[in-house]
Each structure stands twice: as C-alpha cells, then as structure tokens.
C-alpha cells in the first residue's frame, strides 16, 4: 500500500493559482530544423551578459583573437565572455545592449576574418574522474549562464547549492507564445541535452532528477523518451499547457508540491532548477571543451519570410539575423526581443545577441492588432485572479504610480515574475508589467544607495575607531618613551631632594637663642653676599658681552648735559627771585647737596667707563661752551643788580659749587678724550678759564660773607647724606636694569 501511494505521488502533479491560456503561435517555427547563419562582418560582445559584475578585460585594441578565446577574466561571480569567431579587436567602447533601457555598456567589437578558427579544445570525456570543484570551475570559466532568460552564472548556482539539493529540475516547459528554441533543441539534440543533465547530476548528487515539459511539444517528448528508454535515474514529467508554467516557482510547485518562501530561493527547499539550453551548454563546455559562443534563437513573426530556429553567434547584430531570415519590415515595424508577454521592444536593430536572447519576434500589424489607449483602472480584480504568484497587481499599480515604495515592498512586489498575465487580462489596457519593472528598479536603486550610505558610515566609524586607537597607542608610546634620567642625573636629583628635605627639616625646627647670646645670622649674611656676588658677576658679564667697538651714543650724553643745564638755570632763577628774608631749610639743602654729589659721581663713573674710542662732537662742545659763557654773563649781571645787603645761602652756594666742579671735570675729561688731531680754539679756552676763575672767586666771596653763627646740625646732615647715598645707589641699580 505504501509503495502504491509512493508511486502515485511520484507521478502526481500540482496546479498553481492563476495563469492564462494565450494563443501559442508555435507552429510557425517548431517544425523547422535548426540551421546555421552566415557569419557577420562585425561582432559586438558586451562584457556583462549575466547577473553580476562584468569581468576584467584581457585583450586590447588590435589583438588577434580566435573563437572561444576569453575576452575577460572571470573572478568570483564575474562571468567571462569569449570571442564568437576569429578576427581582430577593432574597438573597446560603450555600445547599446539587449536591455529594456537600451543603455550603452562597455563592449568589445571584433571584425571577423572569415576563417572561424577555434582555440585548442581540451574536452573531458571522462568527466566522472574529475572532482566537483574542477567541474564547477570549468563550467564557470567557459562562460555558461542560465539560458532560460535569467542569465545567472551556472557555476555560482551549482556552488551555492552544495550538498542540500535533493531534487534537480530541468525546465523544458517553454510556455511563452511564439518561442520554440528549447523545443527545437530537444528535437535535434536530445542526447546531448541528457548528457548535460547527467553532468549536473554528477556535480549535485540529487536524490531525484525531474524533467518538466508541457504537453504541447509531442515531438520533443518522444525524442526524450527515446533517449531515456534505458535510464531509471531521470524522470520525464509531462504537464498541462498553461502560462506561466515555465516559471521557476510555478514549475517547482507543479512537480514537487513545494512552494518557495517569500524572498527565498528554490535551494532553500532542496530544489535546484536548470534550463534545457543550459544543460546543453554544460555538455559542450565539459565534454567538448567549447566555451559558450552561440545559442539557439527563434526568428518568428509574420514580417519574417523564413521563420525558424537558428544557431546565432553571441555578439551578432539583430539586423544581420533578421536579414538572413528574409525580414520585410513595414512602415512602423516593431521588433521584440523575447516573447510577446515578457519581452521588450528594441529601439534599433544594431543591438547584439547575448546569452539571454531566446527569440526575435517581428510581428505584423495584423498580429498586434490596433494599439489601444491606456485607461483608468476599473477595479475589476481580473489581474489578481490571473496572477500566478497570488499578488494584488491593482494595489501594486497604485503604489507604483504614487511612489509609495514601502507599501509596494510590503505587498511583495519583489515576488513578481513579470510574466505579463495581469496586463494580458486587463480590460483597461494598463501596462502593469512596465510599472512594476520601474518600481522594482527604483526600489533597487534606493536600497543600493542605502547600502552605500551604510558602508560609508561603517568606513567612517572604522576610521574614527582607528584614529582613536592610534591616538591611544601614541599616548601610551609617549608615556613609555618619556625621558628616563641617567645614573649621574639620578644622583644629582637625589642630592637635591636630600638638600630640600634637610632645609625643610631645619625650617621646622624651632630656633632657640640663649639669654645673653646673639643670633647666628651668618647663613643669612652669606646668602646676601652670594646674591650680591651673583649680581656683580651678572653685571660684569653683561659689560663683557657688549662690543668694544660700539661707540656710545653722543645723543644720550647731550641729553644729560641739557638736563643738568636746565636744572642749573632753574636754580639760578630761584636764587635771583628769592626774597632776602627767605630762609632755606638746612636739611633740604644738605639733601640737595648729597643728591648733586651723587649725580656728579655717577656722571664721573659713566665718563670713566666710556670707551677710549668715544669721540666728542666739536660742534656740541662749542655749543656747550657758548651756553656756559651765557650763564656766566647772566650770573655777573644778577650779582651786579643784587642788593649789597643780600645774604647768600651757604647751602645753595655749596650746591652750585659742586655743580660747577662737576661740569668742569666733565669738560676736562671730554677735552682729554678728544682726538689729538682736534685743535681747540685758544681764545675759547681762555674765555672758559676766565669764567671758571670768576665763578671760583664768587664762591669764595660768598663763603666769606656767610654768617659765622649759622651752624648746620651734624645729625641732620648725616641723615641727609645717607638718604642721598641710598637714592644714588637706587638710581645706579635702575640704570643697570634699564641697560640690561
């Protein structure tokens, strides 16, 4: 009983929801054997004829190529393309390809030499002795991709299946109207197709192998049954004709009763599907050693005089194939690549044949009927009834028109197989498939942009983390590479620390002085003397660093002399205007005298420290002499006009005498330091000597006429002198600081 149920289930088929039954229109071509087409003069081979990235070019312009020679390198999911014939590479440039957008893609353009020479072919007749990995790599490097329309790399698909494939399905349904490429291939090359199926089974090691074929192909069914007559490992399943039974998910459900989950793949349920044409290409790649350079293409439509199926070289322009079949275009002729439901209109006929090209349809105006204008949706739900994937095309249509990408994704627009059944039954003639294609392309672009943004964010975060790590490493390296003191430096540091500790200990100890003893200030005195010595050494060092050849500024000396003269004039005016009865404070007079003496000594030191090379400007000396003579005359006039009873203050007289002596010494030193070549006017010298003698006599008379009774307090004079010395010392230190 169990065996009976197993046998019943083994031959059981399931039916999917939806689907349509359009006119088949296959009789135009399925009765004509396969034929070859004359070679074209130019071939355009796009680098990307599959799902995935294009390969890396390995030829250059001007290279000679042979048929089957790789034009690109296939790495990872990149599938290589091969030269369809022998010739010369004339260009590598963008060219429009077989795509609904007709966008230009990078292509290799070859001029055929007409010889059609192959590369050396190395076939693996005993393929069973090869490992699974070797077979998959050979299939991949020979450019085999899904020839049913998807174009997925076959090697990658076999590698992804692994050991979890239990059922291998060969899709021979070919359900779309007009297309008979697989039908004719099975009629003419059934043995090679079965041999390719056995190679795939050897790689995957499935539990069962199923061939699904529609019942509208009786000749192909009979040829396959004849080849499989003595075989028990491959089962041929004939299914009812219904569109789209050839869809991967639909055929999987029909043969196994299993449904592929949303967003999943057939390998998730242990099923792997390959096309009949793909199995034939695998046989030629493994056993014959021939890369895929041609495929079967159906040329059909009432605009073609000789419809049929031909072996078309990849890269052959569509125009060349149509002309070979007797193409008779009308005024508004349309050429469709693919079937009438899933195909797309070509913008021009220079598009090349690629791996996924299975049909070229050139219908007449009678076949297409009158074009009908798109109308508004009437919500009849006919599209939902016809959908084989149980979607809601009406809702997806509104979401696509409204750019509501999230809602379209939620309603599983990605599961749409673009079969065109919804558009076929739509009474409003709405091209639903075009809307869905555009919406899926926009969603894919948005996801690609989001992926790029996420990758950029990840790169930025990784960069920030790397910078933080480098910063932490750098700080750690700086800490570890800090300067370590040498042995002698350590000793010095230890000694300094010991001295500091000793001083701190001494500072914390209380100072006790016995009665009758004086405190020991020797340390403080020594420190003070050390600071003084350090200051003197610093001053000496500063004096030594000065350049010996530097000439002292005469302007500074002149300014000091002018200040002294100004003070002298001011003092004389004060004396002349003073009242006879005005008494001067003797303490102030003593202080002024001390200040005058300090200034005089400071001036003498500056003159004594002046460099011997210092030169005195004779013009300035003459000016100073004239000023001195004017002062002398003014003083004589003041003395002549003074009252005989006026008493001169001896303190002021002493100050004036000191100033006069300082000026006299300054003048003598300037004359002594003058150049020996410089001659002094004798008349001026005599005048200056006379003035000096007059001042001296005047001073003597003033001192003689001074009151004998007036005595200066010696204590006050001493205090004034001390103050004067302190101020003089402070002025000297300030000068040193200013010079520094």
UniProtKB/Swiss-Prot annotation:
GO cellular component, one term: plasma membrane
Name of the protein in question: Ion-translocating oxidoreductase complex subunit C
Cofactor binding note from Swiss-Prot or TrEMBL: Binds 2 [4Fe-4S] clusters per subunit.
EC class (word): translocase
E.C. no: 7.-.-.-
InterPro entries xref list: 4Fe4S_Fe-S-bd, 4Fe4S_Fe_S_CS, Ion_transpt_RnfC/RsxC, Nuo51_FMN-bd, Nuo51_FMN-bd_sf, RnfC_N, Soluble_ligand-bd
Binding of [4Fe-4S] cluster 2, residues: 387, 416, 419, 422
Binding site for [4Fe-4S] cluster 1: 377, 380, 383, 426
Main function: Part of a membrane-bound complex that couples electron transfer with translocation of ions across the membrane. Required to maintain the reduced state of SoxR.
Domain annotation 4Fe-4S ferredoxin-type: ranges: 369-397, 407-436
Taxon lineage: Bacteria, Pseudomonadati, Pseudomonadota, Gammaproteobacteria, Enterobacterales
Superkingdom of the source species: Bacteria
């Amino acid at each position: 009983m169990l065996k009976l149920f197993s046998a019943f289930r083994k031959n059981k088929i399931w039916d999917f929801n939806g689907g349509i039954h359009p006119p088949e229109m296959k009789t135009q071509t399925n009765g004509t054997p396969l034929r070859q087409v004359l070679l074209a003069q130019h071939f355009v081979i796009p680098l990307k004829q599959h799902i995935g990235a294009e390969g890396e070019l390995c030829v250059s312009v001007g290279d000679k190529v042979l048929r089957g020679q790789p034009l690109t390198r296939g790495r990872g999911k990149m599938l290589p393309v091969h030269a369809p014939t022998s010739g010369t590479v004339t260009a590598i440039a963008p060219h429009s390809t077989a795509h609904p957008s007709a966008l230009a893609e990078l292509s290799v353009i070859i001029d055929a030499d007409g010889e059609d020479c192959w590369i050396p072919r190395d076939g693996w007749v005993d393929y069973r002795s090869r490992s699974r990995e070797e077979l998959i790599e050979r299939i991949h490097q020979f450019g085999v991709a899904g020839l049913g329309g998807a174009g997925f790399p076959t090697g990658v698909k076999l590698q992804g299946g692994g050991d979890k494939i239990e059922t291998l399905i060969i899709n021979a349904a070919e359900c779309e109207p007009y297309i008979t490429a697989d039908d004719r291939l099975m009629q003419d090359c059934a043995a090679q197709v079965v041999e390719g199926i056995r190679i795939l089974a050897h790689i995957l090691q499935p539990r069962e192998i199923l061939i699904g074929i529609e019942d509208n192909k009786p000749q192909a069914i009979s040829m396959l049954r004849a080849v499989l007559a003595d075989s028990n490992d491959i089962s041929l399943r004939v299914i009812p004709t219904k569109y789209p039974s050839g869809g991967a998910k639909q055929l999987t459900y029909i043969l196994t009763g299993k449904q592929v989950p949303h967003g999943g793949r057939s390998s998730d349920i242990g099923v792997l599907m390959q096309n009949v044409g793909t199995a034939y290409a695998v046989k030629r790649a493994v056993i014959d050693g021939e890369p895929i350079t041609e495929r079967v293409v159906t040329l059909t439509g009432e605009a073609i005089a000789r419809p049929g199926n031909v072996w078309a070289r990849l890269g052959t322009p569509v125009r060349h194939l149509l002309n070979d079949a007797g193409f008779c275009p009308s005024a508004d002729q349309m050429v469709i690549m693919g079937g009438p439901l899933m195909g797309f209109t070509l913008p021009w006929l220079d598009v090349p044949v690629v791996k996924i090209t299975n049909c070229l349809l050139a219908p007449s105006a009678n076949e297409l009927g009158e074009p009908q204008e798109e109308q508004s949706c009437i919500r009849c739900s006919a599209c939902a009834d016809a959908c084989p994937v149980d979607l809601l095309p009406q809702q997806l249509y509104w979401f696509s028109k409204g750019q509501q990408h999230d809602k379209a994704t939620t309603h599983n627009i990605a599961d749409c197989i673009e079969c065109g059944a919804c558009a076929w039954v739509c009474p409003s003639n709405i091209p639903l498939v075009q809307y869905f294609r555009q919406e899926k392309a926009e969603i894919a672009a948005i996801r690609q942009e989001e992926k790029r943004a996420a990758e950029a964010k990840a790169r930025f975060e990784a960069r920030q983390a790397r910078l933080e790590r480098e910063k932490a490493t750098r700080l750690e390296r700086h800490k570890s590479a800090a300067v370590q003191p040498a042995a002698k430096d350590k000793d010095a540091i230890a000694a300094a620390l010991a001295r500091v500790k000793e001083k701190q200990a001494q500072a914390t100890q209380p100072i006790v002085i016995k009665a009758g003893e004086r405190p020991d200030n020797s340390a403080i005195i020594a420190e003070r003397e050390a600071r003084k010595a350090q200051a003197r050494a610093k001053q000496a060092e500063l004096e030594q660093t000065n350049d010996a050849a530097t000439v002292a500024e005469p302007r500074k000396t002149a300014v000091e002399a002018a200040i002294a003269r100004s003070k002298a004039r001011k003092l004389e005016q004060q004396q002349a205007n003073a009242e006879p009865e005005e008494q001067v404070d003797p303490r102030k007079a003593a202080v002024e005298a001390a200040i005058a003496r300090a200034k005089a000594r400071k001036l003498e030191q500056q003159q004594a420290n002046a460099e011997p090379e210092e030169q005195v400007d004779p013009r300035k000396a003459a000016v100073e002499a004239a000023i001195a003579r004017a002062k002398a005359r003014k003083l004589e006039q003041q003395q002549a006009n003074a009252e005989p009873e006026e008493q001169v203050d001896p303190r002021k007289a002493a100050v004036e005498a000191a100033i006069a002596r300082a000026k006299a010494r300054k003048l003598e030193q300037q004359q002594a330091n003058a150049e020996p070549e410089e001659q002094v006017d004798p008349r001026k010298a005599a005048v200056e000597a006379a003035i000096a003698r007059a001042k001296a006599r005047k001073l003597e008379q003033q001192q003689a006429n001074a009151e004998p009774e007036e005595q200066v307090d010696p204590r006050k004079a001493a205090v004034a002198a001390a103050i004067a010395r302190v101020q003089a010392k402070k002025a000297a230190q300030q000068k040193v600081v200013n010079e520094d």
